Amino acid sequence: MRLLFLVLLVLLGLIQYPLWLGKGGWFKVWDLQRQVAEQRETNDGLRARNTALEAEVRDLATGVGAVEERARSELGMMREGEVFVHILPPGTPLPSGNSTPQASALSKPRPPATPPRR
């Protein structure tokens, strides 16, 4: 009887081995589920980024406003007659010398405006 119990115990152990430690065992399944969850999070972030980029491409392709906004923010461009004002944070030292190219344009007197004709 003891021998039969020992043989059955060994057989049970051999049957359980692939379930827990084998190629498709529970530990492998848990690890793969964790990897799938991480990949889903990555995919969600990339999907959101792609949606934002698609919207930006649509804006750039259809509207002039987006192109103008990008030219202003990234290239520092201005329309004719606009004045660029840069507000420095408190405690920032002032730049030495005249670093504004607009200063000479501001010092020129403007011609008087002519009244509209009727």
From Swiss-Prot:
The keyword Coiled coil belongs to this UniProt entry's keyword annotation: yes
Gene name, Swiss-Prot/TrEMBL: ftsB
Biased composition (Polar residues): 95-105
This protein's record includes keyword Cell membrane: yes
Annotated Pfam families: DivIC (PF04977)
Role, per record: Essential cell division protein. May link together the upstream cell division proteins, which are predominantly cytoplasmic, with the downstream cell division proteins, which are predominantly periplasmic.
Subunit structure: Part of a complex composed of FtsB, FtsL and FtsQ.
PANTHER family (alphabetical): CELL DIVISION PROTEIN FTSB
Cellular location(s): Cell inner membrane
GO cellular component: cell division site; cell septum; plasma membrane
Organism: Bordetella parapertussis (strain 12822 / ATCC BAA-587 / NCTC 13253)
UniProtKB keywords: Cell cycle, Cell division, Cell inner membrane, Cell membrane, Coiled coil, Membrane, Transmembrane, Transmembrane helix
Cytoplasmic side: 1-3
Chain coiled-coil ranges: 28-62
Domain of life: Bacteria
Family assignment from sequence similarity: Belongs to the FtsB family.
Main location: membrane
Region of interest called Disordered, as start-end residue ranges on this chain: 88-118
Membrane topology: Single-pass type II membrane protein
Protein name: Cell division protein FtsB
